[in-house]
Curated annotation (Swiss-Prot):
Its main location: membrane. This is Methionine import ATP-binding protein MetN. It is an enzyme of class 7 (translocase). The gene is metN. Keywords: Amino-acid transport, ATP-binding, Cell inner membrane, Cell membrane, Membrane, Nucleotide-binding, Plasmid, Translocase, Transport. GO terms for molecular function: ABC-type D-methionine transporter activity; ATP binding; ATP hydrolysis activity. It catalyses: L-methionine(out) + ATP + H2O = L-methionine(in) + ADP + phosphate + H(+); D-methionine(out) + ATP + H2O = D-methionine(in) + ADP + phosphate + H(+). Belongs to the ABC transporter superfamily. Methionine importer (TC 3.A.1.24) family. It is found in: Cell inner membrane. GO terms for cellular component: plasma membrane.
Amino acid sequence: MNSVVTRAAIEPRPQAAAEEVVRLIDVKRRFGATPALDGISLNVNRGEILGIIGRSGAGKSTLIRCLNGLERADSGEIRIEGRDITGLQEQELQPLRGRIGMIFQHFNLLSAKTVEDNVALPLKIEGIAKAERLQRAHELLEVVGLADKAQAYPASLSGGQKQRVGIARALAARPALLLSDEATSALDPETTRSILALLRDINRKLGLTILLITHEMEVVRGIADRVAVIDAGRIVEEGQVWSVFANPQTDITRSLLGGIRPQLPDHILSRLSATTGSEVILSVDLAGPEAQGALFAELSAALPHSFRLVHGGIDHIQNQPVARFFIAVPAHEPALAGKVEQFLTARSARVEVLGYDTGHA
């Protein structure tokens, strides 16, 4: 049985059940003796953007291949718009795949076809009349900002432009679900931001449901409504993006967040001892109104001279303030660190004792 950390204690429950586009129930897939998916259960609601993040080899690619029917799950259910696809034959899967669009890391455009023809290709395969499919291609090129590139060939496009063509092609058949497999991994940061902004805009305007696979927390932060963390074929943590960023519950999530959350400076980290030192170093994670900074003024008033601020910062994710700070508490009074920790945790902060600073005078 999987141990999945959810955010029920800190996230309000919805007033009514949302319509599900995707539901996975205890999905398992093995390659020989190795479990690639080990009991995956999750859902994606209509109009939602769900980010699935994990390290290489965590099971992300297998999961997305099971969702579009390229891999068969060994057991469990994969429901797309209410229909379980796990037992469908290939001919039964074909119309269902028309409800699923896909964008890839390496674009997968046909070099001998124009941009217009690449976008129209799914409709050609469906047997749609030429005039209708070209009209649809022109509409989508307007959406992705490439109306002037209709007759260009992929070789003349930048990486970001190629991905925009890929997005337009994925939308050609008016899918209910868009799958994104590391779609920004080959792009520079500025282009990545523009592609994420485009996907968010499409999501809002069309109500398109998006499930994106990535190993980059910045991508999740930039676009997703919810995030699920996958490790060794299991969902180990999931919740709204802001709450996972503010209070990660598992080591793998904290590791994935390491590059974008404030970290204790190396020169202090190198001086930490588990047993003795002049100051106790605490990490303090906050979300919501308490993250705005007033909490430390209250702490200073309640316990004068009880701490100094070492490092940290405040961010805004999904319009929620999220903060992480590191504070140092004098170690000469053994009970003081406990009092500080108690004060902060009583006000919804997550506090962790990191150790003693042996180098601060």
